[in-house]
Structures are given as C-alpha cells and as structure tokens.
A protein has these predicted regions:
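Conserved short alpha-helical segments that host acidic/polar catalytic motifs at enzyme active sites
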Residues: 1-224, 229-289, 295, 383
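Generic beta-strand/beta-sheet core signal
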Residues: 113, 176, 184-185, 196, ...
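Secondary-structure transition/capping motifs at alpha-helix termini
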Residues: 133, 154, 284-290, 308-315, ...
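Phosphate/diphosphate-binding loops
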Residues: 162, 210, 217, 225-226, ...
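PRPP-dependent phosphoribosyltransferase catalytic core
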Residues: 164, 179-180, 215-221, 374-473
Length: 473
C-alpha cells in the first residue's frame, strides 16, 4: 500500500512528467504506460493515464509508482492518450490530486496533465469561484482545465492562446479531446517538452528517454510559447508569442539534477553538461585527494568529470540500495540517519585510510550531507573534501520545483565556511554561477533561470513567497 512520504533526502523535487501520443496503429494505453515509466524519476507519488478511441474517453489514476498503479493495464482501446507522474509541489498528496484531470466542455470531454507551477493560481481560482465553478482538488492543474473548458473561442488553438493570456508561471501541458491531442509550453520555457515521431503517429514528452522507450524518434523541442495540435492531419504549430519576444527562463536545475543523464534537452546533452560541471569544479578548486567519489546517483557524472580533469581515480565509495521501499519517515535526526543508512552504505575497502574528494550535485536544507560524511568517517576515511556541482541554493523556486521556504535553505542563513563546519567536512566548495552557465554550453546564460541561486526571477513572483529570514523560528 502506498503512503505519502516525508522526503528525507536533501534534494529539491520535480513536480511531474507528462507524456502523450496520437497513433492509429498503436495501443495508446500501452505506449503511455511505457512513456510515463521512463519519466518515473520526475514524480513518484502518483500516476495516471487517459485514453480515448475518438468516441469515449476514460481516465485511470492512482497513488504510487507507475508499476504499482498499473499492475494490470486497462483494456481500454484508443489511439489518443496522455499520461502523468507526479510529485506534489502544490496541492496535497491525495487521490483527488492525481492527474490527468478530465472535464466536460461545450465541445465534449477533454483531459489535461501539467508539469510546472502557476504563480497566480489563487487569483484565478477566486475568479472562477465567483463565476460558479466548483473545485474538487487543490491543484493549479484544475484551474487550467476549467479555464479551457469554459472558453468560448471557436478553435482549440485559440482556447490555448486565451489560456496563456490568463495563466502565469511554469507549465508544460499535454491535453486531449476525442479528436486531437495538444501541447503547450510557457513563454519562458521553464519546463521541458519535446516532440517525437513514431512510424505512423506523434508523441509529446517531458524528456527524450520517454521517446526512446517506445521507439519514437526525437524531432525537436517544443519552443517556449508554442502550442502544438496533433490530429489526423498531422502536426500544426501556433506561436502564442514570438520565440525571441523576451529572454527565456529555462530551468538550470534540470541540467544539474532533475533530468535523466541520457536526456537531450533544449539541444544540450545532459550527460555532457554534468561532465562539464565536474571539470569546472576542478578548474575552480583543485582539491588534493587519493580518490574521487560521488554521492549516488546524482553526483555520479560530475564526479567522473572531476576525476578525468584532475587525474585522481574515481572509485565507488557509497553503495545505493536500489530496492529500498518507499517508507514513511517521521522527522527527527535519528530517524533521518536511519533512512540515509538504509539508502547508502560505504564500501569500506575503497574508503578506509583515503583522502576523499566527494562530489554531490546540491545541498538544499543541509539535512543529509553531514550524515553521509559521518558514514564515510566511520568507515575509516582519513579526509573528506566536498565539492558541489551547483552554486549555493539561497532562494525558493515558484516554477515547479520544491526547494522549501527560504528559511529552510541552509545557504540562505550560513556562509560556506559555516556550512562546512556544520556538516563536518574538511573543506567545501560550490561551483560558481559562471561555471555552471559555462557548463550548460548549448544555451545562452541569459535564457536560463538561476533564480534559486541568485534570486533574479524571470517574472514577477508573490512577494510573501520569497520568505523572510526574520521568522526562522
């Protein structure tokens, strides 16, 4: 039985992954299943699939991993389908909040799934309530689908344009009616969305590995501000705004941590970007050591880059238990320590007596770095110098990532030297913002969002959401 979890590891969390297909020669429910399975890393709380055969639409949803929700695949026939995996950044982790959501419009049923986070949800929700709408979830996704369902515009493309006039924030959306499938990406391009081609149909997905999972070919990224419509006539593209109308806000954390290393996103190979981050770390801070190790799995590729640049051998020092159950973890230091020990265990022969350069991708709350360092010390490490392949996280994200309130972010309150002392490392270095931008070499720095590091948000965010450092207690 799936239970809501208190996330015990010190990482930010992506909100979700989306997938959709239009193909008369394939079973949509099977292809969507494989697609969202390939996106499981983007959300583990719930999963859902909507399928239509052109006449009847049906949605199947549940709490848990894709394999838990769909132990037996539905027998629903259909050539159009969308799917979703979720980690909740807005809305509670309850069955009502599982996506896709389905609604009735004047043109018939529609279903929608969303990756991202709106910054004007409350205002839109109030306005819809005044117009007589009722809500059964606490998600911004329900606001989106109700705005679409209420639209009186004559075409779906015009309905999406009207929607994009209303909503602000991050969104990569897939939707379907009984006749077509749609996708759109916000004008800043915060969240990823790609277009793929099967032999006889078309696919939309958050990341390219979902295309690989069903043997679809990558065609291109959906552009920021683009609306795509897919039906029996093929693919049509409509731009809500010119792609160069303003600077974009592509999320840098996709490249640091969220995306699968085998993804290609906005023209950038994720694996290469992470190798570059490791090499940049060595350029900025040439720690001496006997071995380079990673905190698995998120630090693996950057550690390989650091080892290659430095000439210090890379060895596995921490073994990750890939079969650990999704157990509810109560807050508290002892239980947090137990959770980390369940997940990671030192390989003593590679640790004992060694001067270790340890590579991880980020420190957010600072709750587990000290536990990991203590594990290595207890296994006999002589020295532990920690390198982080991103800058200090000092500001919250409002665009689809759960990075906690500002008062919970350790780097917002303490200096690097203080954090180093608190976690028990012998030295600590964060990758510079410039080094990070140079590592993501296929995208211009001005087209990326680094707000969680520098506090410069691409668009207006609620003032009270920035958090006061005065109310730390």
């Amino acid at each position: 039985m799936y239970k809501s979890t208190e996330i015990y590891d010190d990482k930010p969390h992506e909100e979700c992954g989306v997938f959709g297909i239009f193909d008369h020669n394939l079973s949509a429910v099977h292809e969507v299943y494989y697609g969202i399975f390939a996106l499981q890393h983007r959300g583990q709380e719930s999963a859902g699939i909507t399928v239509t055969d052109g006449k009847e639409m049906e949605t199947f949803r549940g709490m848990g991993l894709v394999t838990e929700v769909f132990r037996d695949l539905p027998e629903k026939e259909g050539h159009i389908g969308i799917g979703h995996v979720r980690y909740s950044t807005t809305g509670s982790s309850i069955p009502a909040n599982v996506q896709p959501l389905q609604a009735d419009s004047i043109d018939g049923p529609m279903a929608l799934a969303h990756n991202g986070n709106l910054v004007n949800t409350l205002n839109l929700r109030r306005r819809l309530l005044l117009k007589g709408s009722t809500f059964s979830t606490s998600m911004d996704t329900e606001v989106i689908i109700k705005l679409l369902a209420r639209s009186r515009r004559p075409t779906e493309e015009e309905k999406f344009k009207e929607l994009m006039d209303e909503i602000h924030g991050a969104y990569a959306i897939v939707a379907c009616t009984n006749k077509a499938r749609y996708g759109c990406r916000d004008p800043f391009g915060y969240r990823p969305l790609v277009l793929g081609k099967t032999e006889t149909g078309w696919v939309l997905a958050s990341e390219t590995p979902a295309l690989d999972a069903i043997d679809a070919k990558f065609v291109r990224d959906i552009l920021p501000g683009e609306i795509v419509s897919i039906d029996d006539n093929g693919v049509r593209s409509t731009m809500y705004c010119p792609v160069d109308a303003h600077k974009h806000g592509i999320c840098s954390f996709e490249y640091i941590y969220f995306a699968r290393p085998d993804s290609i996103m906005n023209g950038q190979d994720i694996y290469q970007a992470r190798l570059n981050m490791g090499r940049k770390l060595w350029e900025e801070c040439r720690f001496d050591g006997d071995v380079v190790m990673s905190v698995p799995d998120s630090g693996n590729v950057a550690a390989l880059g650091y080892a290659a640049a430095s000439g210090i051998p890379f060895v596995e020092g921490l073994l990750k238990n890939k079969y650990m159950g999704r157990t509810f973890i109560q807050p508290g230091q002892k239980k947090r320590e137990r959770a980390v020990r369940m997940k990671l265990n030192p390989i003593r022969m590679n640790v004992e007596g060694k001067r270790i350069v340890l590579i991880d991708d980020s420190i957010v709350r600072g709750t587990t770095s000290g536990i990991i360092i203590n594990l290595l010390r207890n296994a006999g490490a002589k020295e532990i110098k920690l390198c982080i392949s991103s800058p200090p996280v000092k500001y919250p994200c409002f665009f689809g990532i759960d990075t906690a309130e500002r008062k919970q972010l350790i780097a917002a309150k303490y200096s690097t030297e203080e954090i180093c002392s608190m976690i028990g490392a012998d030295a600590l270095h964060y990758l510079s913002l410039e080094g990070l931008a140079e590592s993501i070499s296929c995208i211009k720095k001005e087209d990326m969002c680094f707000a969680c590091f520098d506090g410069i948000y691409p668009e207006h965010v609620p003032h009270n959401g920035l958090g006061s450092m005065d109310d730390e207690e």
